[in-house]
Amino acid sequence: MKILHVCSELYPLLKTGGLADVLGALPQAQNQIGLDARVLLPAYPAITAGIQNTQVVAEFDNFAGHVVLRYGEYNDVGIYLIDAPHLYGREGNPYHDAYYNDYGDNYKRFALLGWVGAELATGLDNWWRAEVVHAHDWHAGLCAAYLFNKGKPAKSVFTIHNLAYQGQFSYHHLYEIGLPTGMFHVEGLELFGQISYLKSGLFYSDASTAVSPTYAQEITTPEFAYGLQGLLSGLKAQGRLVGILNGVDENIWHPNVDQYIPHHYKLKYMAGKKKNKAELQAYFNLPQDESALAFVMVTRLTEQKGVDLLIESADEIVKQGGQLMILGSGAPHLEQGIRELAAQYPENIAVKIGYDEALSHLMVAGGDVILVPSRFEPCGLTQLYGLQYGTLPLVRKTGGLADTVVDSASESIKARTATGFVFENATPEALRHCLQRAFALWQKPRAWTMVRTDAMEQDFSWRKAAEQYRTLYERL
């Protein structure tokens, strides 16, 4: 079965969020189970720098100007690149300029991405024709509309990585992107008087997926749906909206092969974890105390990630003699709040503002508990890394966090299903109580080791996700 993934980011060449991680791993996993998956991307400078050996597949002029379609390979996956320098030849972020202003021609840049995705299902490449066009997030949302307008020559799937970004543009652009005005309708592209690329993906695709079963349920409610609850709850009722969890790329995130950590370890030989903890404490200039419960947090510093909840309850960690290490950047007032905590409690709390890939790996490997107290989290990857590394996730019960972490209540510990700590209400009090429960378990080393073992035995491989997507494709 020939699958074309249409997207705007690819790890490690270009990444602004978790979308890139998915596209860096899922197509490869699908090829390993016998599918024929390829990826279509705009030829951004960062992408072309990493995929230099390409051949021309097609050359044409359309509503977006002169376009060359190229083909190359990256990590054993076939990659199509849309070479249109007037649209994509911009350094840095793919969506906005250095001042965070969205590019004024984004409507055209991402319409072209969708258009080429549909054309690859109708013979644009003489040697390969997509049978399923799998579009990701709003950037690729018009794929399904172009396919619909062509009489649906291929099956279409649309994956929502984050519903908060919708790709809305003025309706008059419809004349510039080659779609009939009849599609601008509440039963079509229209949302609040504008064209919505995200709604296009949902409305016209044969099936839509969200990146976790709980998030697929949450987005049918007004709180999470951004005005699309009617459409989304309808799709859910028809069985056209399902949740499939993201996986972990075990070539990059596994404690026995991780290239960024000084000491490798695995379930049967855990000595390396203690050594990584000592290295981590030394990096952050905290006391190298093996008995101190070490909490780590690697995140964007935003309210969505629950950082404000942690700021208000972090004194509990200090009171109980624990340590807290934070890596991230984001809202200035939260950066300031974290810095003030570290200044107030220099023996217990340390922070690095910014992002550091190598340090993030050491934190996951060296910590005892990884904090993910998000207000909402479509899937979440850091808690999956925590499970993989035996760093117990402490999470709020939402989205993918609810699907992947089982609370260490006494009955679940006995049943060998517990893998971390879970709290429900997005309040500092609820988080504080959860921190207290983590300290209580830490006082019982045998029980802690048991939960850690069960956490590390969880399977969140991309192979598992690839099989679930194959089942979905076959159902269409």
Swiss-Prot record:
GO terms for molecular function: alpha-1,4-glucan glucosyltransferase (ADP-glucose donor) activity; alpha-1,4-glucan glucosyltransferase (UDP-glucose donor) activity. Keywords: Glycogen biosynthesis, Glycosyltransferase, Transferase. ADP-alpha-D-glucose binds at K15. Its EC number is 2.4.1.21. Pathway: Glycan biosynthesis; glycogen biosynthesis. InterPro entries: Glyco_trans_1, GS/SS, Starch_synth_cat_dom. PANTHER family: ALPHA AMYLASE DOMAIN-CONTAINING PROTEIN, GRANULE-BOUND STARCH SYNTHASE 1, CHLOROPLASTIC/AMYLOPLASTIC. Belongs to the glycosyltransferase 1 family. Bacterial/plant glycogen synthase subfamily. Synthesizes alpha-1,4-glucan chains using ADP-glucose. This is Glycogen synthase. It comes from Haemophilus influenzae (strain PittEE). The gene is glgA.
